[in-house]
């Protein structure tokens, strides 16, 4: 199965291009400005600024505890910054924004988040129900809903598990179901926390090939990983966050394993 304009998951190139209009100065899709976040009195994210443009594939690397997962939760709206600001497609994402039910629903349709631990987001009785849940909330015609679910399950090779319980699957199968469930909503950006963790080589190849095709179709990907070889394989722009919460951009091979990235 291939992803193309108007094919497979109905890639919406107008949506992928943003909402600012042709010829206008296009804001970054994701922008963090001096963001601070603390948990239980401990500063987890300390003055982080970064941006992700439309059509980019960006990888966050860094040691455990540097704040990668928290940054992704902030970007998905699961956490709110204590200080600084977060802009999505030029709009400030804060408590007031997320209390607007229409804006929040559209935001969560456009930002697809896959947890590192797939158990955190699987909750339906069967794989088919899991993959259908998100797009079923979007008011799609029945035939379009069925097509999205079928295509997403085939894409991540879980179609034969349609009636299986997600809770009885292997870790790698759960990861692929979680990816299918998010991708079936056709988000503008995929935010993926360690997307290849727990996957065997064949499953990893499925994910890598999908991500390359998704970006080629005009979509955006932000992922965290510890693996430099994966970043090189994807040709991703690398953003490193060190143990002191400093943000550094550098070619992957020049940033040593002592900073927390591994081969």
Regions found by a protein language model. Give the residues of each.
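Conserved ABC ATPase signature
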Residues: 165-169, 173
């Amino acid at each position: 199965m291939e992803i193309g304009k108007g094919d497979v998951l109905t890639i919406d190139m107008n949506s992928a291009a943003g909402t600012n209009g042709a010829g206008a100065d296009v804001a970054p899709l994701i922008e963090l400005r001096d963001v601070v976040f603390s948990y239980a009195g401990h500063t987890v994210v300390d003055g982080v600024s970064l941006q992700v443009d439309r059509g980019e594939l960006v990888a966050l690397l860094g040691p455990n505890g540097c704040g990668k997962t928290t940054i992704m939760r902030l970007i998905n709206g699961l956490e709110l910054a204590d200080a600084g600001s977060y802009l999505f497609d030029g709009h400030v994402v804060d408590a007031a924004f997320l209390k607007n039910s229409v804006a929040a629903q559209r935001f969560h349709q456009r930002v697809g988040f896959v947890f590192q631990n797939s158990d955190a987001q699987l909750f339906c009785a069967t794989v088919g129900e899991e993959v259908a849940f998100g797009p079923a909330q979007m008011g799609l015609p029945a035939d379009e809903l069925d097509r999205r679910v079928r295509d997403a399950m085939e894409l991540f090779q879980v179609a034969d598990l349609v009636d299986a319980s997600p809770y009885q699957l292997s870790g790698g199968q759960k990861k692929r179901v979680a990816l299918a469930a998010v991708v079936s909503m056709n988000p503008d950006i995929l935010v993926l926390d360690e997307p290849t963790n727990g996957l065997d080589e064949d499953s990893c190849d499925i994910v890598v090939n999908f991500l390359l095709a998704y970006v080629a179709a005009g979509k955006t990907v932000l992922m965290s990983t510890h693996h430099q070889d994966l970043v090189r394989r994807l040709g991703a722009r690398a953003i490193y966050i060190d143990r002191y919460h400093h943000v550094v951009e550098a070619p992957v091979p020049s940033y040593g394993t002592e900073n927390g990235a591994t081969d």
